[in-house]
Amino acid sequence: MRYPGGLSKAVTFSYDDGVVQDMRLVEILDKHGLKGTFNLNTSSFGPGKVNWSSRRMTAEQIVALFKNSPHEVAVHTLNHPFLEQLPPNMATYEVLGDRKNIEDIFGTVCRGMAYPFGFSFSA
């Protein structure tokens, strides 16, 4: 498999939840000409939305950081639930609702997704 420029290897950087530390990560990635994927929960922007809301960026900060940046913004569900514990219709709502919000906010097609809490099967 080849990547752009004929390269045979690639590295990815992926960060979840839209936390304030992402602002510093974007600075570092930009400084070195690297791109990252930032997986956002669009119902959890800003203070008062989740238990650790002081770590979350506001909607305004998210837009300012990513609206015209080279970084990918991807689905991470609306509310960060354990998807495997939800009925199929609720899991679908979480994923598609987050995708719609991201596409509305950034005016682009959203293709990526990261499962909240990771994903694994018990043996």
Where are the predicted features?
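Short, glycine/serine-rich, charged loops/turns that create anion-binding
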Residues: 18-19, 43
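Generic enzyme active-site microenvironment
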Residues: 12-15, 74
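N-terminal pre-catalytic segment of deacetylase/amide-hydrolase enzymes
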Residues: 1-13, 20, 54-56, 62-63
